[in-house]
Amino acid sequence: MRTSKGTCLFLALISALAVACGPAARGDDGTGDGPDGPPPVTTATLTGKVWAPNQAPGQAAPGQEIPISGALVYISTSKPEPIPAGVYCEECVPTPQGGVLTAADGSFKLEVEPGNYWLIIQKGQFRIEQMIGLSLGTTALPPNATTLPSQWKPEAGLYMPKVAVVEGTNDNIEDILGKIGFGTMAGNSFGTPNGENGPEVTMFNYTNVAASLLMNINEMRKYHIIFFPCATSMSGINTQLSDQTVLANIRRYVSEGGKLYVTDWSGELADRAFPHQIELGDSGADSEGTYDPMTFTGTLTTTGDADGGLYESADGKAVDNDLNAWLGLQMGPQENGGVGLYNPNAFEVTDNWNWIRKVNPVMLGTDMQGMPVYDQPKAWVTGSKPGEAGATNKPLAVTYEPTGCGKVLYTTFQTANAPHVGLYPQERILIYLIMEIQTCSDNPIF
């Protein structure tokens, strides 16, 4: 309630303002630049959306484009240091002053002083650098200026990860890589990638060549990511995966910043090198043993087998909040043959060939204060195996950081098992996770 004293004071103020705005006090000459006019524009505003390689407007089917969530966008007066051409440790640092991370729909907005700058857009080892002149007002960047590159061309400011792919027999991950522009691979063919890989991709096979890769740490160091998709037989490298010298190479590669992508029946590669983080649930024995995250030595008391039975998970769910928000904004082909908006809380995950009974935190060492540091595996997608006791809402896609700066991604499902146009939800999730496993590492233990 207002008092009468307050009313008198209010009227007095109104009277004083009326006098101040009269003809004797020219507070507004009618130009609109006075206290009631719009504030002057003093900054340059930069807007846009970051897109996945080869999946921007004009590249993907209308409405089925793939944005990049969590990409770093910033400006600098100097060109950034080049991304190393091989494996390296990228520890997390604060976001550059004035930099932003893109939203779930890939959008960003920067407000800076007008001038000429380097504009850097980066997600993991995907990076585009370009000079840009910014003047007062808003500049909206077109997709061709904000789409992550699918080639390694540092002299032109274009970077993408160097990858090795061990060619699977049932999971043609190279088709997904082809759809995001790796090499000249025909993304819809589900055919042999030989001759299509390009300089950014090196192909191996499980029969004999993969063994030489795993036995040569210097060859492994050439690649930021090594893909080990499902193979019906691991006999070509089974002996090597029981050899602690080879397993030490895998541990050393990850420790130095390397990323491993492993799916279903190829799980022995990760399970034998790092036995503790994931316990597989199907009939094959789970690996048991030890490993030292700093010396890379280890033991295997039980040599595991990741082979399991086929099932479809009708209740797939993106359990990471950022992944959930990102997937929920997208539209694309469905497993039933239609096209529609994805529900990140209920989608079908097909061609699972094992299930994860549980994940375990693993102590890696201590920090500078002497406190223990644990590797806590992270589930990105969950789902159920029908008819299997205890296999409800279990992790289907997991990442963990078992040593140093690197990461391991394991999925129970195959990603590409038949030719088709476009990208299904689990294939889009793969693209998201390829981006995520390249990001920096917090508090690595060496």
Where are the predicted features?
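Bacterial Sec-dependent N-terminal signal peptides
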Residues: S15-N54, E129, L141, A145, ...
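Extracellular ligand-binding/catalytic regions of CAZymes and related secreted enzymes
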Residues: G30-T31, D171, D271-R272, I278-T290, ...
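Structural motif
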Residues: K49-I68
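A short, solvent-exposed loop/turn motif at the edges and junctions
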Residues: K109-P142, T147
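Helical hinge/lid and interdomain linker segments adjacent to catalytic or ligand-binding clefts
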Residues: A164-I278
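A glycine-rich, often tryptophan-bearing local segment used as a flexible ligand/cofactor-contacting loop or short
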Residues: S233-N352
